Amino acid sequence: MRRFHGNRPKTQYHAAYALSPLRRLVAGEAVTVKLRVTNTGTAAWNNAGPCAAVLGDHWYQGRTRLVSETEVAPLPAPVSPGQTVELAASISVPDRPGTYTLAWDMRAQCEWFTKPGDVLRSQRVEVVYTR
């Protein structure tokens, strides 16, 4: 997926995330994570069309090795600047045990909100074979 580059101001598409910590998950399982996402940018997020806004996840091993990135939760309705929406993200845990970083990001206009060098809202997750 592309990151926003070029002429779009950084503040046009921006988000804040609130969620409970995920510390330990089972390798290969599907998990639903509930989180609140606030539109802290200046543009409304559209929930319809080919480039509608969606919540995505990025799984990293170490600090920079991207394992996967997936769109995990569509918006139930358009989200105006300043508005908060509650989402249920369906995530797929990596198949191999280890320590991962799970980062959250929104996508709109067919591009991720974050730019290279931005800090994503992330959490460290231990992936194990069994609980």
Task: Annotate each PLM feature.
Residues G98-A108:
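Short, surface-exposed ligand- or partner-binding patches at beta-edge/loop junctions that are enriched
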Residues A27-A43:
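Short beta-strand elements of extracellular/lumenal beta-sandwich folds
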Residues T40-L66, D105-R107:
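Short acidic, flexible loop segments centered on an aromatic residue
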Residues P74-V85:
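Short proline/glycine- and polar residue-rich coil/turn motifs
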Residues H14-Y17, H58-L75:
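Short beta-strand and strand-turn-strand segments in soluble, beta-rich domains
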Residues R2-V26:
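Low-complexity, acidic Ser/Thr/Pro/Gly-rich terminal tails and inter-domain linkers that flank the onset
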